[in-house]
């Protein structure tokens, strides 16, 4: 019996994770990647003997990764508990390998401590490591007036984590009713106010308000606008830690590619999709607004047509609907709706290698360097869309953990500066190089990397133009739609297209949102939707496989 076929557009974390899951569901899956190597935003750059992860660098919830590597052909395990009791109770690994036995066959994952060192503009810092007593000690030193507030924040963030992540994290909000059912809980938890406002309930010191609200910037969210449900990030990291893949995030990408191919999947590079092909139910051109619309495959930029029973976009939601599907096939995701959606911020990212001999580098693996303004800078980036005279940055130095990414006596680093997306109208060819020079001068002159400009060996940078041109992100956004309340849950793009049958979304633009754990959750949610829609036999969807072609009993259709 011929297996159903699937095409996934894009080989980011979402596309690779879903590819593995579709192979485990019994599909024959092809991933089409526009670039010359896998990863999408997680592309890896090799330059002058240095290796740089161009995108995600923070790994949390390692059991999500273990779950993928443990899958096998025709055994999707979608019916197993999403958060087994043992996984939650075991907590985080603090030393050695933090990947499970299946993961460790493909990639070595290790814990990082502290999670982040957060530098304030006055030179003081806070080591954020998830240890409650260490956190109390640092608050005592920096803001003793906020000790009692931390205890209340800790308890309330845990309640949000337990309800919002453990219980509701995998909820697919496909209709208004599914969202209305959870609103009372969110109101009770005070999780619909903004995250920054939530932090200010507990902390009076501006430094503590920043420490306990900044993390949504790592998933494209403005702390002044995202709902307080994101306070659960504190407890997600506290529960499972922050981790790193030896060899860089690219090593994890390669592990996913290897697993996908071992399960029989195919990945093609330099394969840009120009159009998602749509017909009516009879395979003809749809006529009129009431005609059915079914995804039948894709057409590549070179004209090649590929047929499939399922088409999934791991690309940007806005770009998918505006560029790949003709407007006449879209009613819900119309041009007007897509263009009115708020996109996340963009980034200027500087990748640089430098000589380390004789350098006493007092930095950590992950460093957050906050500028003199917090709320005002966020408003400049997200609302005014101007390039401010000041900036904050995330400085990543993986060679402190993994020297293999650079030649001996050298470091490979990148620093990421949040900036407005291309709705700003800024000419990045002009302002980009000037910002890069300011950022590198700051790191040098403020003593973070003394003598940096003389020590530089290689450098490369990207601006919002890279995200728009190379990654096909609408307006050059870096994280998909902005995760404000009005674009969350039901109001976030749906994993199953409302316009075209057999078309699905996965990744940062879909539910539940951006960030590596959310993207892997998105893959599982989309796999469940596909399993339901195609009546996948329960023995495949929920556990051990059956022989291809074995007839399914109606009562055994997946009910996850």
What are these regions (language model features)?
Residues 2-162:
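N-terminal glycine-rich phosphate/pyrophosphate-binding loop and immediately adjacent elements
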Residues 121-226:
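Rossmann-like flavin
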Residues 205-219, 390-396, 449-512:
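A glycine-rich dinucleotide-binding beta-alpha-beta segment and adjacent secondary-structure elements
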Residues 232-283, 295:
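Helical element adjacent to the flavin cofactor pocket in flavoenzyme catalytic cores
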Residues 274-285, 290-406, 547:
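Mid-domain catalytic core of redox enzymes
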Residues 278, 532-560:
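Active-site-proximal substrate-binding core of FAD-dependent oxidoreductases
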Residues 355-464:
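C-terminal segments that line or cap access tunnels to active or ligand-binding sites in enzymes
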Residues 510-530:
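A conserved FAD-binding loop/helix module that cradles the flavin
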């Amino acid at each position: 019996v011929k297996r159903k076929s699937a095409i996934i557009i894009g080989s980011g974390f979402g596309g690779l994770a879903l590819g593995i899951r579709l192979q485990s569901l019994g599909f024959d899956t092809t991933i089409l990647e526009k670039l010359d190597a896998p990863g999408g935003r997680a592309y890896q750059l090799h330059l002058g003997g240095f290796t740089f992860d161009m995108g995600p660098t923070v790994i949390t919830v390692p059991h999500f990764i273990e779950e993928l590597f443990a899958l096998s052909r025709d055994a999707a395990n979608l019916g197993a508990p999403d958060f087994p009791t043992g996984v939650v109770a075991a907590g985080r690994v603090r030393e050695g390998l933090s990947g499970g036995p299946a993961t460790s066959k493909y990639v070595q994952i290790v814990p990082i401590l502290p999670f982040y060192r957060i530098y304030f503009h006055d030179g003081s810092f806070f080591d954020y490591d998830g240890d409650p007593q260490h956190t109390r000690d640092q608050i005592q030193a920096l803001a003793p007036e906020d000790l009692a507030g931390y205890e209340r924040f800790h308890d309330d963030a845990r309640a949000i984590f337990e309800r919002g992540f453990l219980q509701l994290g995998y909820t697919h909000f496909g209709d208004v009713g599914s969202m209305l059912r959870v609103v009372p809980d969110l109101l009770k938890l005070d999780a619909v106010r903004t995250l920054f406002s939530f932090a200010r309930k507990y902390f009076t010191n501006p430094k503590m308000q920043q420490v306990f609200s900044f993390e949504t910037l790592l998933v494209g969210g403005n702390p002044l606008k995202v709902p307080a449900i994101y306070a659960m990030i504190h407890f997600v990291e506290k529960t499972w830690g922050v981790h790193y893949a030896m060899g860089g995030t690219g090593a994890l990408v390669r592990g996913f590619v290897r697993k996908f191919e071992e399960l029989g999947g195919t990945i093609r590079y330099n394969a840009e999709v120009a159009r998602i092909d749509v017909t009516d139910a009879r395979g003809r051109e749809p006529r009129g607004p009431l005609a059915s619309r079914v995804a039948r495959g894709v057409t590549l930029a070179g004209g090649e047509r590929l047929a499939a029973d399922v088409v999934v976009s791991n690309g940007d939601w806005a770009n998918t609907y505006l560029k790949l599907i003709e407007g006449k096939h879209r009613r819900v995701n119309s041009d007007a709706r897509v263009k009115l959606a708020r996109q996340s911020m963009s980034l200027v990212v500087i990748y640089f290698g430098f000589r380390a001999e004789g350098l006493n580098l007092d930095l950590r693996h992950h460093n957050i360097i906050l500028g003199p303004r917090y709320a005002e800078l966020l408003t400049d980036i997200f609302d005014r869309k101007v390039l401010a005279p000041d900036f904050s940055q995330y400085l990543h130095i993986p060679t402190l953990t993994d020297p293999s990414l650079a030649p001996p006596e050298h470091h490979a680093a990148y620093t990421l500066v949040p900036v407005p997306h291309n709705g700003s109208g800024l000419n990045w060819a002009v302002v980009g190089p000037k910002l890069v020079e300011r950022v590198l001068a700051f790191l040098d002159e403020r003593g973070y990397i003394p003598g940096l400009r003389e020590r530089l060996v290689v450098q490369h940078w990207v601006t919002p133009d890279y995200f728009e041109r190379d990654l096909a992100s609408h307006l050059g956004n870096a994280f998909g739609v902005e995760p404000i309340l009005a674009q969350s849950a039901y109001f976030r793009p749906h994993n199953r297209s409302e316009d075209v049958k057999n078309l699905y979304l996965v990744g940062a633009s879909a539910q539940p949102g951006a960030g590596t754990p959310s993207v892997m959750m998105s893959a599982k949610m989309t796999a469940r939707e596909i399993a339901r829609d195609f009546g996948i036999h329960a023995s495949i969807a929920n556990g051990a496989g059956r022989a291809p072609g074995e007839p399914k009993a109606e009562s055994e259709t997946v009910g996850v």
